[in-house]
């Protein structure tokens, strides 16, 4: 029996053992399923919770009193208004976790309550002082920019924090309206937006439950935006970029990307280096980046780079060892101006002939950049700038101190065609007299014929005065007696003169035209350069000794001093024309007003 029993056991087939690979696969499946369940659980819990809350919200009104059942929320206000909340500020993007939510350029974010029927803010009533709640919406809410949505649609897109995470939005989450306008406080995102379907958020504003029962106020929403992890802020672009920023801080240049590597290989590692190469040879810079950068990308890159704030560092390239003439560059090697014999001319003020000359110097400087030196002298603003020489300025003594001892014998007269008399500035003919020109502020300088020159002596100062204006018969009015000359007052009230004492507008125009068309005047203006000052007059370049200024170095004065003297005479002639024109216009206005008053009586 025993043997038979053992035989029966031996006859049973042995159980097949599983292979090691199949065991591992089964274990991985179980582990994956457990992980999937653990990840789905918080999502399912949240969805179920939201659905339960929504179902309860629908059931609550049926349990209230009959008065509440038959008074549903209206779309507008009690007087038919269509009330809507609106954000009036755009957000500063990109946003990072832990960073404060701000408006563009750090501005405050404002919200306003408006009546959509009129488009005007609601400033009165209980709605104008509501308390609002800030919430987070999914970026896919109202993608069609439909202006009409229901409260249920808005609430269904409110985003809550992830399971086990901090509240998605922290800070001051309530806004109180004052006369229909409110300001968002300090709010911060604690989580990024990469975990939701749209991968973007929106900020929303709503009226909390319990406020304005029976009145529907449409909620506000911002544009969709991404919230990145704060660790990504290390790779953030700078607006505007700084000169010492690494070049990948610029738009379209990714850190350790292809463009970044090409620029680094070419020795361009900072924004300053990028701008310098852009100024000196933009074609070469474009070639360094290669064909992978499109024209649109290039334009955006250059536009962003040019927003960089420059420092005050200057460089200068001298044309000769004497260092009397040189071109000035800023710290990105862009032309700033020209220095010639202690005179500084900005690049914008150069005449066409000067620009041709300066362009040659700039090219030579770029070719011999090792000879360019950093400017370590005084500020260029402290150098004599001819465009700033204004004889009507408050302190003319300082501006013209170096020209106060030029002998009057050196002043040439201007022969103006079309006139019977020779014009000259109202200066004494005494060759021993010194040019001590100190006009008062707002005092106008005129032109007189030699026979009518008038001097006003006050504290040993010789002043230039404006002779009486021309009558309508044409020509310059003569002074009848020396007594009249002595009684002339440059500060007298010209409005007391009769209408016939002033030029007509046509005569003034013809006078100015003849004055500027004169050959000597044109020669002087051409030789003195073509820049323009603040008042529209040209000013000298002081780059060369013009024919009109030759022969005036007997007293050892520099060429620039003689040019300024000639310029003052030209400016006096110009001011004379403008002064007469203005006074004539004022006089005509007074006459018209007087006639209107007489007609009214």
Swiss-Prot record:
Pfam families: Calmod_bind_C, Calmod_bind_M, Calmodulin_bind. The keyword DNA-binding applies. It comes from the Eukaryota. It is found in: Nucleus. Expressed in leaves, stems, flowers and root. The keyword Transcription applies. Keywords: Activator, Calmodulin-binding, DNA-binding, Nucleus, Transcription, Transcription regulation. One of its GO terms (molecular function) is DNA binding. GO terms for cellular component: nucleus. Residues 1-74 are annotated as: Calmodulin-binding. A motif (Nuclear localization signal) lies at residues 1-8. Transcription activator that binds DNA in a sequence-specific manner, likely 5'-GAAATTTTGG-3', to promote the expression of target genes. Belongs to the plant ACBP60 protein family. Interacts with calmodulin (CaM). This is Calmodulin-binding protein 60 D. It comes from Arabidopsis thaliana.
């Amino acid at each position: 029996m025993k043997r038979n029993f053992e035989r029966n056991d031996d006859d049973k087939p042995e159980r097949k053992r599983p292979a090691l690979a199949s065991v591992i696969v089964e274990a991985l499946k179980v582990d994956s399923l457990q992980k999937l369940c653990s990840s789905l659980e918080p999502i399912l819990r949240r969805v179920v919770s939201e659905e339960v809350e929504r179902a309860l919200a629908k059931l609550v009104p049926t349990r209230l009193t009959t008065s509440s059942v038959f008074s549903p929320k209206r779309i507008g206000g009690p007087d038919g208004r269509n009330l809507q909340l609106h954000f009036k500020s755009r957000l500063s993007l990109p946003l990072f976790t832990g960073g404060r939510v701000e408006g563009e350029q750090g501005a405050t974010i404002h919200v306003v309550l408006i009546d959509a029927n009129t488009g005007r803010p609601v400033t009165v009533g209980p709605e104008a002082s509501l308390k609002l709640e800030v919430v987070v919406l999914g970026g896919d809410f109202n993608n069609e920019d439909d202006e009409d949505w229901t409260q249920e649609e808005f609430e269904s897109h409110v985003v809550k924090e992830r399971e086990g995470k901090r509240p998605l939005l922290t800070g001051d989450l309530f806004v109180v309206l004052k006369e229909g306008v409110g300001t968002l406080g300090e709010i911060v995102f604690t989580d990024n937006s990469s975990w939701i379907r749209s991968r973007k958020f929106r900020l929303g504003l709503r009226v909390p439950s319990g406020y304005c029962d029976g009145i529907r106020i449409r909620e506000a929403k911002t544009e969709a935006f991404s919230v990145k992890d704060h660790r990504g802020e290390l790779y953030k672009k700078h607006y505007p970029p700084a000169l010492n920023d690494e070049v990948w801080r610029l738009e379209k240049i990714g850190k350790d990307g292809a463009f970044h590597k090409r620029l680094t290989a070419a020795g361009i590692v900072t924004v300053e280096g990028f701008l310098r190469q852009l100024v000196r040879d933009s074609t070469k810079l474009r070639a360094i980046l290669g064909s992978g950068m499109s024209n649109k990308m290039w334009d955006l890159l250059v536009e962003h780079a040019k927003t960089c704030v420059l420092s005050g560092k200057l460089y200068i390239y001298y044309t000769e060892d004497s260092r009397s003439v040189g071109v000035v560059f800023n710290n990105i090697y862009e032309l700033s101006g020209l220095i010639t014999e202690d005179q500084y001319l900005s690049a914008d003020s150069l005449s066409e002939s000067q620009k041709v000359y300066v362009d040659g110097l700039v090219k030579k400087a770029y070719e011999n950049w090792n000879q360019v030196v950093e400017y370590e002298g005084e500020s260029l603003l402290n150098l004599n700038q001819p465009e700033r020489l204004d004889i009507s300025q408050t302190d003319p003594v300082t501006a013209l101190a170096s020209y106060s001892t030029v002998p009057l014998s050196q002043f040439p007269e201007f022969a103006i065609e079309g006139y019977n008399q020779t014009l000259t500035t109202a200066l004494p003919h005494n060759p021993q007299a010194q040019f001590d020109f100190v006009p008062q502020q707002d005092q106008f300088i005129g032109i007189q014929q030699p026979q009518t020159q008038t001097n006003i002596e006050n504290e040993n100062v010789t002043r230039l005065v404006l002779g009486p204006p021309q009558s309508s018969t044409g020509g310059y009015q003569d002074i009848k007696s020396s007594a009249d000359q002595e009684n002339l007052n440059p500060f007298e009230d010209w409005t007391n003169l009769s209408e016939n004492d002033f030029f007509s507008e046509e005569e003034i125009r013809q006078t100015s035209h003849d004055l500027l068309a004169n050959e000597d005047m044109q020669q002087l203006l051409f030789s003195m350069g073509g820049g323009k000052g603040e008042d529209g007059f040209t000013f000298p370049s002081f780059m060369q000794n013009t024919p009109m200024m030759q022969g005036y170095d007997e007293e050892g004065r520099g060429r620039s001093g003689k040019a300024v003297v000639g310029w003052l005479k030209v400016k006096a002639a110009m001011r004379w024309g403008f002064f007469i024109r203005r006074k004539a216009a004022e006089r005509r206005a007074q006459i018209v007003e007087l006639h209107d008053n007489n007609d009214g009586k």
